[in-house]
């Protein structure tokens, strides 16, 4: 079983006099920086000068600096910009201003694990990764609780890397729920696998296939949309809150029997074998090489071209109409 730390076990003392530079002020940067500040840490925010994020961070009461200035001043540099800009940002602004004894901190392990960034040997390399969106990280903190985080130390140069890691987890509010020990390798491989095989790739592809099956059999697209896509959230919410068996106990008896007996016909041993192939390509670096190469060559078009194809699919055309019925004021 994984090791878990709780709030009462952790002290902020080891980092209370250290300055934390939060690099980036998107959804996670906003939430984590404000939680740290409210927990009493010395926080600066490192951003591109003059942008909308700069104004937002300043209006939230933060001292805002350029990325280079923030890294030079801080003891802990907490990197919360998108994965694919981290390497260049590190080369241009962060790396030249990171000196012995500082800590490089992340909320995702990819840049370090795949060596997009190669940290010097005389700094700590740590991770605090909340398992929820930034809005939830902030919301649960303000409610007096927190969003769990997974935590790891890749490099302990100072001997105090774990104190820094756990202190950040406490300041973010995550220790109130629990800090779960992991490794950089485990975080990125399981995170990418979940995104590809289940959460994003697998579930979206399954929904499209189910929709096509019904429409090709002569059913109305609008009805198919409701049955295979719209109602999915109800089931996922139950699974998240009550577990898989808890979901089975809360659906109709017909849904329970049909799902338990027919589900394995859809997701069978061959599906699991293909999932294994997806995992292997993550583990051996095949996917990383493909992704980085595609992004360097095509930028956002590396994935936009697939999304453009889906935009013309019937499930999206019908979906836009159905969503307008339920949320007339929403924009997509």
Swiss-Prot record:
InterPro entries (UniProt xref): 6-PGluconate_DH-like_C_sf (IPR008927), KARI (IPR013023), KARI_C (IPR000506), KARI_N (IPR013116), KARI_prok (IPR014359), NAD(P)-bd_dom_sf (IPR036291)
Pathway info: Amino-acid biosynthesis; L-isoleucine biosynthesis; L-isoleucine from 2-oxobutanoate: step 2/4; Amino-acid biosynthesis; L-valine biosynthesis; L-valine from pyruvate: step 2/4
Enzyme Commission designation: 1.1.1.86
Cofactor: Mg(2+)
Residues that bind Mg(2+) 2: 191, 227, 231
Pfam family, one: KARI_N
Name of this chain's protein: Ketol-acid reductoisomerase (NADP(+))
Organism for this UniProt entry: Cenarchaeum symbiosum (strain A)
